[in-house]
Amino acid sequence: MLLWALLPMHAQKEALVASNDSVDTLLEKLLPEANDHLNAHMNLEFYTSAAGYFTEGTLDEAAFKINRVRLEILGSFSKDFSWHFRQSFNKYSNPHALDNLSSSIEYAYVNWKPSDKFNLTIGKQFVAMGGYEYYLNSNKVREFSDFNEYVAAYQAGLSAAFNFSPTQELVLQVTNFRSGEDEDMYVYGRPAEIAKAKVPVITTLNWNGLFADKALQFRYAASWGQQAEGRNILYLTAANVYEKGPVIAYLDVMYSRQGLDTHCIISDMQGPIVENPVTAQHTEYLSFIADFDYRFHPHWNAYIKGAYETAGVYKTNGLFEKGLYRKTWNLQACVEFFPMKGSELMIFGHLLHKGHQLTGRARALGAVAPDTQRISIGLVYTIPVF
């Protein structure tokens, strides 16, 4: 898993593989006398698996899957300016109305670093919320919590990072709240009686700190944005991490209060008995995510992971009464094998159990949520193209 050893600590800004090797890049070969700061690197990320999917212990399907293929190109063109582009081949849309980019483009930004104390990033980037699971390159996560699964993590905007010391960083970020129209974000669209937001942006204040010789790591953030006229969203997110030697352990606490149901979990509870389903309003979500990783051999790593999550409504609206609607938990166990020392090649075996408990409010809407399981083996490899 990724090491939070150095700041700045922008979420998922690390390259898929390290770029400080001794092999000349294509630019260095073509332009041997060029500026020392002119460079570029390309990485290809590949993740495939074979998995069996179960509902209440009964096999539904077993199949092979290409979970993720991503290509990134990153580099710099002067001492102070760098850039990063990344595209996923597992998701696609026509250019969205708001940011004019396909959802397949995850990164498209330029970074200006005039000093060691300050840097500025503009373009499509990662929303700088807290949480270790959220922060990790998704290549490192076999199963996300529901909370992180439904966050629109890549948005166009601007962020400024202030590094007060090698172990303390403060990030102020303003990005779009959404990429496209409201109809693209909410499962049943924006309620007709609520006007569209004129400034659909979200502002994030993020603090990253390292203590105890970097063994204790914290990543806290607060985000607030406007979803529509009179409807706002709040995120409070925190990562508490211990990383030393072969051990990585963390506890994430993630909370969101949403004027409109951005996560769509409660909105999706409306079953066939609801003739005219609508997007829920005034929803809130809370998640606790815990993980313990142990690298018991240079070629072997194992971890156990669990999450406990709740979904509720904090103010009655329409069909949705105030109160708790669902409790969810997932339990995971994974063994990872790294056959080549110093390589990003990894083979894994993973077990997942996900359980749900619906309250009477959810069942009154016709909601159904059986327990599910998954058994998977897979391969992950990040290839440094140049």
Name these PLM-found stretches.
Residues 14-18, 49-59, 97-98, 212-386:
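Outer-membrane beta-barrel pore domains
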Residues 24, 67-71, 103-110, 154-158, ...:
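Hydrophobic, lipid-facing positions within transmembrane beta-strands of outer-membrane proteins
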